[in-house]
Amino acid sequence: MHNPDHDHIAELLHDNEEFLAFAWASSAAVAKKRMVLGQCEKVMFNVGGWKKARQEQQMRDWFGFVPQYLITVDATFCEQASDREFCRLIEHELYHIGVERDEDGEIIYSDHTGLPKHYLAGHDVEVFFGETKRWGADESVKRLLEIAKNAPFVSETNIAACCGNCVIG
């Protein structure tokens, strides 16, 4: 299920598996009174001394390394999710790993590491239904509406065709 939007991640993982790790949570989280099924975070330890050492050790115990980014998903949801729902959740979380680009859309590389500069990206469209109802759609909502008029690139058939279990079974 290749997505060129994530090539910057795939290229890093090819050379350095420590860029990204995945973890299962035993249940969903609740944030702002909404169920959260997945979360992408840039791994940072905002503590000192032994707390930082313990947190780093926990990551090494879990993954064998301390990742730069961690995606955690609700195992209970994933267990019952359709292939499409699961793939969409993972894809959503991967979109939170943004890559800095210049005005021409080219990836910006770090002068120190030579690697692409990444950041934790917010959502493309963050708006309330009531706000749009009252004031109308802003440019990002209008763009989303135009995109939504087209059929999705990925269908159920595409997902089944790329799944090792489905192809073998």
Stretches with model-predicted labels:
Residues 1-80, 100-169:
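Metalloprotease/metallohydrolase-associated module, dominated by Zn2+-dependent proteases
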Residues 88-100:
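Active-site recognition of the HExxH zinc-binding catalytic motif
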